[in-house]
């Protein structure tokens, strides 16, 4: 799991940065799991915490080349593949109760991060549900 959830991020990021020109952006999608640390998924949490540690250092390394690096950490977000215990109708219910995010919520954060002036660095956005989820 670390190979997929951490090592792949690092390898892809380093290769992308090598090919990029100034004025580019790298946007990582991490997870609130890095900070919420719920039991039962310690390896996944370790991977996401690794990304959370990697991104600020990587941002500093690439800043002089005018490559911005940001991290979005979504909370509980609806997805068919991730939560088999929450079928689509239950996810719609939780979204309606403000207890689950939609992918569009993360896209809004990404758009905000990527459309800021080059002089600014929105380096971390945490997107959480307004109310606690089950």
Question: What feature does the model see in each segment?
Answer:
Residues 71-72, 90-134:
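C-terminal helical subdomain
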Residues 23, 36-42, 98:
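Active-site loop immediately N-terminal to the catalytic Tyr-X3-Lys motif
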Residues 18, 60-63:
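Alpha-helical segment proximal to the catalytic Tyr-Lys
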Residues 31:
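Residue(s) in the substrate-gating loop at a strand-loop-helix junction
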Residues 15-23:
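A short helix-coil junction within the Rossmann-fold of NAD(P)-dependent oxidoreductases
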Residues 1-2:
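A hydrophobic alpha-helix adjacent to the NAD(P)-binding/active-site core of NAD(P)-dependent oxidoreductases
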Residues 13, 47:
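Active-site helix of classical SDR
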């Amino acid at each position: 799991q670390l190979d997929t959830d951490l090592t792949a991020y690092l390898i892809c990021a380093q290769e992308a940065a090598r090919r990029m020109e100034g004025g580019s952006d790298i946007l990582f999608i991490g997870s609130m799991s890095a900070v919420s640390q719920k039991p039962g998924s310690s390896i996944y949490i370790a991977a996401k915490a690794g990304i959370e540690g990697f991104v600020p250092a990587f941002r500093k390394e690439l800043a002089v080349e005018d490559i911005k690096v940001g991290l979005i950490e979504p909370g509980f977000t609806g997805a068919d593949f991730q939560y088999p215990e929450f079928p689509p109708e239950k996810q719609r219910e939780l979204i309606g109760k403000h207890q689950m995010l939609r992918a569009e919520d993360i896209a809004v954060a990404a758009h905000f991060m990527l459309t800021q002036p080059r002089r600014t660095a929105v380096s971390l956005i945490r997107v959480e549900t307004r109310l606690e989820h089950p």
